[in-house]
Amino acid sequence: MGLRLNELSPGVGAKKTAQRRGRGIGSGLGKTGGRGVKGQKSRSGSSIRSGFEGGQMPLYRRLPKFGFTSKMAMTTAEVRLSELSQIEGDVVSIETLKAANLIRRDMKRARVMLSGEVTKAYTFKGIKVTKGAKQAIEAAGGSIEE
């Protein structure tokens, strides 16, 4: 017999019919349609933005501001050791990382993180390296030039 496209149908219970609201008290959601009685939220077209507290000073304005966003972090890319295998050659610099599409073109700095294995000896020029990554690079025979 076999399976045919024109004989396919959804499994039993897979498609529930939508609950029609406000269509008689026998439906279980008649009259007020599950909205309760009166008030702003019972009216059509009403939507109260999240964080609105009825006019009192909201929590996000009662609490003090703190911290800042570092502009340096916005232009510093993070590169994993495992991603370095995509680079042609054994010299790693900002230019070679951009050429291999490992970092975005607008990045000015890069930092190499310890994640994965180093496959060969790389020479790093002008790139920051974490402590763990430095140990892994030197263990593989690589070097770091500031």
UniProtKB/Swiss-Prot annotation:
Record bears the keyword Transmembrane helix: no
Annotated Gly residues bias: 24-37
GO terms for MF: rRNA binding; structural constituent of ribosome
Keywords: Ribonucleoprotein, Ribosomal protein, RNA-binding, rRNA-binding
A UniProt-annotated Pfam family: Ribosomal_L27A
InterPro entries with a match to the protein in the record: Ribosomal_uL15, Ribosomal_uL15/eL18, Ribosomal_uL15/eL18_sf, Ribosomal_uL15_bac-type
Region (Disordered): 1-55
Keyword Iron-sulfur: no
BP-aspect Gene Ontology terms: translation
Lineage: superkingdom: Bacteria
GO cellular component, one term: cytosolic large ribosomal subunit
Function: Binds to the 23S rRNA.
Family: Belongs to the universal ribosomal protein uL15 family.
Subunit structure of this chain's protein: Part of the 50S ribosomal subunit.
Protein name: Large ribosomal subunit protein uL15
Organism of this sequence: Psychrobacter cryohalolentis (strain ATCC BAA-1226 / DSM 17306 / VKM B-2378 / K5)
